[in-house]
């Protein structure tokens, strides 16, 4: 896996822009899920356990002003940009693999 940079802008306000870097793409995808889980905790602070459907996570991603991943290509040593659709497909594959490995 390759070094990955997450670019995030939740609202129209450019001051809401942030970035995070991760050792690999899987860690970045898990980071995106944690951002959503933190959002849910703030939305419903009295709820002890957070559960959600992946479709709600995808709606959250769609509602963000911008979300992009830059993934290092180890052959060219350049970062390849990926959009929200790629992120959602990658999260789906990650969750599906984890579900299949539990059985």
UniProtKB/Swiss-Prot annotation:
InterPro entries: EHR_sf, ERH. One of its GO terms (molecular function) is identical protein binding. Gene3D superfamilies: Enhancer of rudimentary. The keyword Iron-sulfur does not apply. The keyword Ribosomal protein does not apply. Coiled coil: none annotated. Pfam families: ER. Signal peptide: none annotated. Keywords: Cell cycle. Homodimer. May have a role in the cell cycle. Belongs to the E(R) family. This is Enhancer of rudimentary homolog. It comes from Caenorhabditis elegans.
